């Protein structure tokens, strides 16, 4: 299959108009900016962004009420209807503010270009969820059959950045959902890459339930990896069964953390405790000797 033309070139015909409007301050020209009924604008079906912060939308809605919409949305006209290309957050906030109309720039663009613009607009947003960014990268790579190197040049990011973001897609669905719902950060998620699904979800439960920092998560993941790589032969014994099941270790960890800020990890046939708060260690020792 022949490779589609590079995405940057495919957008070249419409970017000059957008730049003219946004960068040169000409958006007040009557033939560019129109006032549309808020219900006339249909969401972009190719919008890769699925989750929007409610607090952020509320803040923007309040700003729109007080100052109006400062940056018009981009739309394309088709069969008497307007489809959103860029500005989903502004559209949602305007609806939240119960605005009857919205400022829009009508762009002359082919239907098949809508996905391209929506993806680029979202990729360039700083507040895009890392998982949504990874999915957008994946869609660009697959739709245009480009390499990560080519994509990195288009989005003006390093190839390492693109590769690291894409690795988030290897996480279990449960971890991906937690990242999408902002129950964990991208820092937490990156620590879990490379672990099997069961270990990912065990650590995920600890992150959420015990509010672990990224550093604490790294320590916990390191302990899991040490357990997996532990060579029993070096210690002169053959272990025929797991010393403690994963769910039992999780319950033990939960109890130790709640009472003594301790973490337990398996190392061969041993349970090793890591202390995170020295002041509670003495209480733990007294409990063990009582």
Curated annotation (Swiss-Prot):
Disulfide bonds: none annotated. One of its GO terms (molecular function) is DNA binding. SMART domains: ParB. GO terms for biological process: chromosome segregation; positive regulation of sporulation resulting in formation of a cellular spore. GO terms for cellular component: chromosome. Pfam families: HTH_ParB, ParBc. Keywords: Chromosome partition, DNA-binding. Coiled coil: none annotated. Belongs to the ParB family. Involved in chromosome partition. Localize to both poles of the predivisional cell following completion of DNA replication. Binds to the DNA origin of replication. This is Probable chromosome-partitioning protein ParB. It comes from Helicobacter pylori (strain ATCC 700392 / 26695) (Campylobacter pylori). The gene is parB.
């Amino acid at each position: 299959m022949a490779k589609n033309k590079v995405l940057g070139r495919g957008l070249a015909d419409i970017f000059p108009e957008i730049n003219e409007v946004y960068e040169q301050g000409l958006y007040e020209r009557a033939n560019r900016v129109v006032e549309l009924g808020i219900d006339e604008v249909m969401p972009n079906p190719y919008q890769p962004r699925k989750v929007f912060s409610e607090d952020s939308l509320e803040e923007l809605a309040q700003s729109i009420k007080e100052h109006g919409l400062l940056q018009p949305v981009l739309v394309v006209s088709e069969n008497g209807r307007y489809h959103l290309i860029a500005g989903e957050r502004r559209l949602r906030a305007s609806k939240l503010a119960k605005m009857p109309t919205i400022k829009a720039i009508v762009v002359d663009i082919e239907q098949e270009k809508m996905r391209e613009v929506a993806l680029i607009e979202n990729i360039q947003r700083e507040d895009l969820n890392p998982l949504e960014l990874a999915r957008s990268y994946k869609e660009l790579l697959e739709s245009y059959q480009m390499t990560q190197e080519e994509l990195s040049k288009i989005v003006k990011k390093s190839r390492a950045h693109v590769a690291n973001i894409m690795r988030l897609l290897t996480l279990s669905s449960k971890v991906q959902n937690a990242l999408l719902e902002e129950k964990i950060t991208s820092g937490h998620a990156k620590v879990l890459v490379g672990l099997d699904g069961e270990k990912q979800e065990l650590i995920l439960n600890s992150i959420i339930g015990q509010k672990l920092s990224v550093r604490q998560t790294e320590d916990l993941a390191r302990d899991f990896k040490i357990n997996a790589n532990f060579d029993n032969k070096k210690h002169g014994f053959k272990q025929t069964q797991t010393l403690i099941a994963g769910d039992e270790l999780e319950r033990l960890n939960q109890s130790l953390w709640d009472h003594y800020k301790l973490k337990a990890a398996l190392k061969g046939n041993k349970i090793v405790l890591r202390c995170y708060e020295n002041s509670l260690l003495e209480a733990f020792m007294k409990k063990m000797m009582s």
